[in-house]
């Protein structure tokens, strides 16, 4: 079964030439919305995803504006309002070493370099300079771990395990 990933939501139309206004959910809009790429529009539940080919992409304020092959006026794209844009897992690009997709990290077990199990990563926050991983502990409050080289020693996405160095004051 194909695993799908949300890259944006069509929130409105823009102009009369078939452009749609998208709130992007991807860290790679230039790659995802590149002219010629295929995206899949997910409308109402129970309907098959509709493949569409991107014919133009530009940014406007906080939105990405897209047009699709075969849809050249506002009346043809009006029905897409509220739909999600997704890509299948095989369309996800390779990342550089030490970079991971959120879905690869969320659900990983976190252990110290001494083998002590701390919990499971449930969420990733992006407050500024670096991401912060939220660790759900079996007992007690959630633990916040900054994703920096001094703390995160190893990430094994195949085994769903992250090994960290516990600095003084971290726990």
Swiss-Prot record:
Record GO terms (molecular function): ribosome binding
A cellular component term, taken from the record's GO annotations: cytoplasm
SUPFAM superfamilies for this protein: PRC-barrel domain (SSF50346), Translation proteins (SSF50447)
GO biological process: ribosomal small subunit biogenesis; rRNA processing
One Pfam short name: RimM
Main location: cytoplasm
Subcellular location: Cytoplasm
Disulphide bridges: none
NCBIfam families in alphabetical order: 16S_RimM (TIGR02273)
Subunit structure: Binds ribosomal protein uS19.
Protein's job: An accessory protein needed during the final step in the assembly of 30S ribosomal subunit, possibly for assembly of the head region. Essential for efficient processing of 16S rRNA. May be needed both before and after RbfA during the maturation of 16S rRNA. It has affinity for free ribosomal 30S subunits but not for 70S ribosomes.
Domain notes: The PRC barrel domain binds ribosomal protein uS19.
Record family assignment: Belongs to the RimM family.
Entries under PANTHER family matching the protein: RIBOSOME MATURATION FACTOR RIMM
Name of protein: Ribosome maturation factor RimM
Native source species: Bacillus cytotoxicus (strain DSM 22905 / CIP 110041 / 391-98 / NVH 391-98)
Lineage per the UniProt record: Bacteria, Bacillati, Bacillota, Bacilli, Bacillales
